[in-house]
Regions:
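Alpha-helical membrane-protein topology signature
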Residues: 1-181
């Protein structure tokens, strides 16, 4: 497996989990909500680079959909512009390196559609739909991680499946690992 993809998956794991922690922790002030959205978005964009580097178009589409629904949660539009420009640059750079040869499995396409629908549900505050969609999508991303030997993606998707399961069961999240009934 490509070392670049492994490193990117590790960065995405840290950014996604930390951003998620800041994003949903209701004890924190509102500034952490915007910061959490930005860090989570960095994780999305890094996962787009991972998807491009392994040539999995469905992962790219899923992460781009998540990023699209995360952008309105920012307060700082300069950060939004910088992240969008970073995404365009990575798409061109990694696309050229792969000769724009991408694949998409049926499982990846289904996971992508489910993740994007979950992101839409998040934007509309339909939490039950979001939780179920993201658990299903992250289970598929665990499979993609195993298939491509991406430890960072495996850990991140596993963490999000666990978080989703606890939310479905009615637990309230506090921080990265803290839950109360």
């Amino acid at each position: 497996m490509d070392t670049c993809a492994q490193l990117l998956a590790g960065v995405a794991m840290v950014a996604g989990s930390y951003g998620s922690m800041l994003f949903v922790d209701t004890k924190k002030e509102a500034a952490n909500y915007s910061l959490g959205a930005q860090v989570f978005m960095l994780g999305n964009i890094t996962n787009i680079a991972v998807g491009l580097s392994i040539g999995d178009l469905s992962m790219v589409v899923a992460q781009a959909g998540l990023a699209f629904f995360t952008i309105p949660m920012f307060e700082n539009r300069k950060v939004s512009l910088a992240l969008v420009l970073m995404y365009i640059y990575m798409t061109l750079q990694l696309g050229v390196a792969n000769h724009f040869h991408f694949t998409a499995s049926w499982l990846g396409i289904a996971a992508s559609a489910t993740a994007v629908y979950g992101a839409w549900a998040m934007a509309k505050a339909k939490w039950d739909i979001m939780n179920w969609c993201w658990v299903v999508a992250d289970l598929a991303f665990i499979y993609i991680a195993i298939l491509n030997q991406l430890l960072g993606l495996f850990v991140l998707a596993s963490l999000f499946v666990w978080h989703g399961y606890l939310r479905i069961k009615g637990y309230k999240r506090h921080g990265l690992f803290g839950y109360t009934k």
